């Protein structure tokens, strides 16, 4: 079969990530050229791996052993040849599961994205990685959805990679916020840096909050690396105001075309603005508060970006790596430099999340909004200024973390309740 170019497919074959982009590309929006590996290809390869009573893990392992067949490999080569620049053009390969980027859930980081893929062999491997991520630990641990499992699956979206000078996200709706970083957007989504942010209104920019970025993600050959941000860029915003307003206007057109508020991932290179992802907003952004932050009688009050609304109180639990996840107890306030998809299973357990870096599109922010817990991100030196075990109040509307009660000496230095 010929793999359909982006814009030709039906929604049932596309999955949640690719479907809105196909709609936008057909309508003339600046969506990078690409193609999809439709759901039917996933199902065709899966059919040879199924066996009576086989578990998801067993099916996954059989799929890996089988690999992409000769027919799919040939189709991938033909589809790459049809792209601008031909088969050696660097592309982004993204999962497009039927269960992600819906109005109910974004599925942040649940499945694979591989950037800088070049050539048919690397493409076949990347498609397999996306397919295998259908059995990610988070999904296998989740309860099955009655009546839907057989209809679900994994398509794959392939697009020409934009070697971005700047990238970010725009949230449309009643509150419009644009966030941007230098380089590829991977550093923003991964929460590795704190982006510049612009609050927008009908008359233009209402407020600009400078970010904190000491590294950027760039493509080097077929790899995406994080490199130190050049000194000349460290005091320079990723975007000028004219470009901010251009992206805002584009976002309003997308919102009107798709029929509702979206969060819109975009990238800018020498050719202009490119739309990389458009998904329905799964939760309302907290409104910025102009109220004073006196902590309601509390002691130390730290300030950051309110990324998920609500208020919660609990003991501070500091985690410095994913290897420490087992230390978390229900009701803890998670404190980390940043989080990534491997941390996702913690979020239903914790009362709130606080990070030193990140923005509205970072993993911690998206998952916190979906789970419904407060999140305050980009809190400078939070891991040094908050004691392990101290009782704190996290206010996701105000963007504050207030110490209510310092750590009890009985808990010992560096220990919180439940550390044993």
Go through the PLM ranges and name each one:
Residues 1-157, 164-166, 234-242, 255, ...:
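N-terminal beta-alpha lobe that positions the nucleotide/phosphoryl donor
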Residues 119, 172-175, 200-204, 220-223, ...:
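Short acidic-glycine loop/turn motifs at beta-strand connectors
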Residues 180-261:
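Conserved catalytic alpha/beta cores of large enzymes that bind or transform nucleotide phosphates
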Residues 188, 280-285, 311-332, 337-420:
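Acidic, glycine-rich flexible loop/linker segments
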Residues 193-198, 287, 292, 297, ...:
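Catalytic phosphate/nucleotide-handling subdomain of diverse soluble enzymes
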Residues 256-282:
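Conserved metal-phosphate-binding beta-hairpin within the catalytic cores
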Residues 274-319:
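Long, charge-dense accessory insertions within large macromolecular proteins
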